[in-house]
Amino acid sequence: MENQKEKILVVDDEASIRRILETRLTIIGYEVITASNGEEALLVFRKEYPSLVVLDVMMPKLDGYGVCQELRKESDVPIIMLTALGEVCDRITGLEIGADDYVVKPFSPKELEARIRSVLRRADKITTSLGVPNSGIISIGFLKIDTNKRQVYKNNERVRLTGMEFSLLELLVSKAGEPFSRASILQEVWGYTPERHVDTRVVDVHISRLRAKLEDDPSNPDLILTARGTGYLFQRIIEMNKL
């Protein structure tokens, strides 16, 4: 099975949820490891190096936010947060500190499986073509984007982006100067279809994260601009240079 080599860490203090997810994800071909609290999650992560982390927000002692912050200090591993129904602040906070996506409890295991597949696909190190040559470096002023290695450099220093952040940047750069609506970004980067009712602030938070990492002045951006009433666009003219 194509998912066989992917290892997923499920972190939740509810044994029943860990059990259900371990069973379902194992059946469809993933290797699953679990942790029942935040401290254990960090220990398991550093030992097992999973491909993706499914992380509950509400846990005693070290909660999901704390775990996410610690993981982001050392890794760009994809993180999907499990948040409470109706707690919008949980979702936004999780995204702001580095989560790639979220699923609201109670959730359908099939929904989570779909989100895992989508996030892993977009976090894959093999570049998918979005109209940008995958055999070159894109130079944009002080930025260089290596589409082969999925790496970004600012003033010749590596900037660490998560897989979703890179995919979002790659999408915007692929049609520099053309605005993308939030709905189209959700569909292209996260795989959410139009009929899904998804909080578009997912896009806004990731844009803020990109600006914080790439712009000289994130509060007055000159790379990633807001297209009033539409969404976002990448402003600079780009030059393609072969590797």
Curated annotation (Swiss-Prot):
The keyword 4Fe-4S does not apply. SUPFAM superfamilies: C-terminal effector domain of the bipartite response regulators (SSF46894), CheY-like (SSF52172). Residues 76-94, 135-236 bind DNA. CDD domains: REC_OmpR, trans_reg_C. Gene3D superfamilies: 3.40.50.2300, 6.10.250.690, Winged helix-like DNA-binding domain superfamily/Winged helix DNA-binding domain. GO terms for biological process: regulation of DNA-templated transcription. The modification 4-aspartylphosphate is found at residue 56. Residues 7-120 form the Response regulatory domain. It comes from the Eukaryota. Probable promoter-specific protein mediating the interaction between DNA and RNA polymerase. This is Probable transcriptional regulator ycf27. It comes from Pyropia yezoensis (Susabi-nori). The lineage of its organism: Eukaryota, Rhodophyta, Bangiophyceae, Bangiales, Bangiaceae. The gene is ycf27.
